[in-house]
């Protein structure tokens, strides 16, 4: 298979600097890496943070962002086993880890102190060819729609892991704060497929419509509700058993600690800048409420999340645009205009 020396990609040289769509070199895979011809990549809010550089973890510079890349294996390093040229493969947020620390040994590779992150510390999927550690790369079944599966590689895995972290059982109520964005729209579907009753919190008629189309049961418009906490407690007959916070609102996180029911779990996923999780200690203790953080999933979570997709139980409401339009997608993110998930086609 002929691999070019150069490719199209979007790169920036300083945080917040110009997003340049240009010719850049095709990377060479290391001994443990795959070279993947990326066909499509989802666009995540994390990509926006990587570009802005507003998280306490520094990015590499210059940087090619992106960590939801779906494509085809075109080359591999000499130490790679279990992969073949032509296999479908996915680039995830966790590009690689040491595999020898206590976290990796317990399958918590994302907590590895030496974790290598796609589109953050490792050039990511906003290019036509990208490298990924062969151990961490996602195995995508042949015949899969690569545009549709791209958001599952981060957004899908992330919310699936968060739902598992809530420790719910079939028939329980789960409230999803930020229900109709890229993460929330998938969380609704995973929750339904896992047997939960779904309450969504977001705003606007378009998002309310999407929520119902995806199988949600009760929608709360936070901009309209006169008493959001009471409305949720009443709708769920005592409060949600679990709350998945994918919104990036500190106030929304604080509210969630008040509408979760006794013995329930509040799961933190979204990462508002400089935010604190505020909870009344007396209430939290008396209600025996758990507040947990949920980061990206491990390899087993990825396999399971992809299986839900392969069986047709979840799909990403996507809008496909060219990679050259990435700056416009970021602008929509900043303005809060994203419904569902944007996916970039690297050929355009």
UniProtKB/Swiss-Prot annotation:
Residue sites binding Zn(2+) 2 per the record: 98, 101, 104, 112
Query: What CDD domains has UniProt attached to this entry?
Result: CAD3 (cd08297)
Q: What is this protein called?
A: Alcohol dehydrogenase 2
Q: Where, in this chain's numbering, is NAD(+) bound?
A: 178-184, 202, 207, 269-271, 341
Chain sites annotated for binding Zn(2+) 1: 44, 67, 154
Keyword list (alphabetical) reads: Cytoplasm, Metal-binding, NAD, Oxidoreductase, Zinc
> Which cofactor does this sequence's record say it needs?
Zn(2+)
Name the encoding gene, please. ADH2
Write down how the cofactor binds this protein.
Binds 2 Zn(2+) ions per subunit.
What family does the database annotate? Answer: Belongs to the zinc-containing alcohol dehydrogenase family.
GO molecular-function terms, A-Z? alcohol dehydrogenase (NAD+) activity; zinc ion binding
- What Gene3D superfamilies does the record point to? Medium-chain alcohol dehydrogenases, catalytic domain, NAD(P)-binding Rossmann-like Domain
- Output the InterPro entries linked to this UniProt entry: ADH-like_C, ADH-like_N, ADH_Zn_CS, GroES-like_sf, NAD(P)-bd_dom_sf, PKS_ER
Reaction catalysed? a primary alcohol + NAD(+) = an aldehyde + NADH + H(+); a secondary alcohol + NAD(+) = a ketone + NADH + H(+)
Q: Give the record's GO CC terms.
A: cytoplasm
Name the PROSITE patterns for this protein: ADH_ZINC
**UniProt EC number:** 1.1.1.1
Record text on subunit structure and interactions = Homotetramer.
Membrane-crossing segments per the record: none
């Amino acid at each position: 298979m002929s691999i070019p020396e150069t490719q199209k990609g979007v790169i920036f040289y300083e945080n917040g600097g110009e997003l340049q769509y240009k010719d850049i070199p095709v990377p060479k895979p290391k001994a443990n890496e795959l070279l993947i011809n990326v066909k499509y990549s989802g666009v995540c809010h994390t990509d926006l943070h990587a570009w802005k550089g507003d998280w306490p973890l520094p990015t590499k510079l210059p940087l090619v962002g992106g960590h939801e890349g779906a494509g085809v294996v075109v080359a591999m390093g000499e130490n790679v086993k279990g992969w073949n040229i032509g296999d479908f493969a996915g680039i995830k947020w966790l590009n690689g880890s040491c595999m020898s620390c206590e976290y990796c040994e317990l399958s918590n590779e994302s907590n590895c102190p030496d974790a290598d992150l796609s589109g953050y510390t490792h050039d990511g999927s906003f290019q036509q060819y990208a490298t990924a550690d062969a151990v961490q790369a996602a195995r995508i079944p042949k015949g899969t729609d690569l545009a549709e599966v791209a958001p599952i590689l981060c957004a899908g895995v992330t919310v699936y892991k968060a739902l598992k972290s809530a420790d719910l059982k079939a028939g329980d109520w789960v409230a999803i704060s930020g229900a109709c964005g890229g993460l929330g729209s998938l969380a609704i579907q995973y929750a339904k497929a896992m047997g939960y009753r779904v309450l969504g919190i977001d705003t606007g008629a378009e998002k309310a419509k999407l929520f119902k189309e995806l199988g949600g049961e009760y929608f709360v418009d936070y901009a309209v509700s006169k008493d959001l906490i009471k409305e949720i407690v009443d709708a769920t007959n005592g409060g949600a058993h679990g709350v998945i916070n994918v919104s990036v609102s500190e106030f929304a996180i604080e509210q969630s600690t008040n509408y979760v029911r006794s013995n329930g779990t509040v799961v933190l996923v979204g990462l508002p800048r400089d935010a604190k999780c505020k909870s009344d200690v007396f209430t939290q203790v008396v209600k025996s409420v758990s507040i947990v953080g949920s980061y990206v999933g491990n390899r087993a979570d990825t396999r399971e999340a992809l299986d839900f997709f392969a069986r047709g139980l979840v799909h990403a409401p996507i809008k496909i645009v060219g990679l050259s339009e990435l700056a416009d997608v970021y602008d929509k993110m900043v303005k809060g205009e994203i419904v569902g998930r944007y996916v970039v086609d690297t050929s355009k």
